[in-house]
Amino acid sequence: KEKVEEKAEAEPVKDEPVTRPTVAESVLHFDTEKGIAWPLEGELLLDYSMDQTIYFPTLEQYRCNPALVIEGAVNDKVFSAAKGKIMDITENEVTGCTVKQDLGDGYTAIYGQLKELNFKTGDTVEAGQVIGYVSEPTKYYSTEGSNLYFELQKDGKPVNPKDFLPELPMDTME
């Protein structure tokens, strides 16, 4: 027992600075003025609507929609809407292969109906980089056809992505 104590005293704690990543490397910032880019250019099949229900053709029912459902052909490239870190990659029966991306400041982008992802959980993706490709639609979107499910959240609650996207000439749902 004495030898252990002596050894502990013989090796004082070193007072060395701890190296940490710079703020720019570790903290993401979502610029609400700059907004986001369209992850896929295509017709809006289903618009964001959390205030009133909209008709979902495949389901043959009216529901609120926390996302944009953007038409795309199978194998179309899906681009990162903003710089962010891949938080999670999951598979579910509604949106298929789904990617959650932390954009910073409480904002999260969710991309669904994907395949052949180019990134893994923990990777940082720059705006405009290809995240993956449009997949065959799940059974929940079979009538709508192949598409990208694109949701934007602030602190875990859906917000309208169109409030942060530039207008497109093909945007027919305004």
Per-region residue spans from a language model:
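Polar/charged, compositionally biased leader and regulatory segments
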Residues: 1-56, 61-64
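Generic structural motif
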Residues: 40-44, 72-86, 112, 125-128
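Folded interaction domains in cell-surface recognition and envelope-stress signaling
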Residues: 44, 67-68, 76, 107-108, ...
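Gly/Ser-enriched beta-turn/beta-hairpin loop segments
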Residues: 47-73, 92-105, 140-144, 157-158
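Conserved, short, structured surface segments that act as functional micro-motifs
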Residues: 123-174
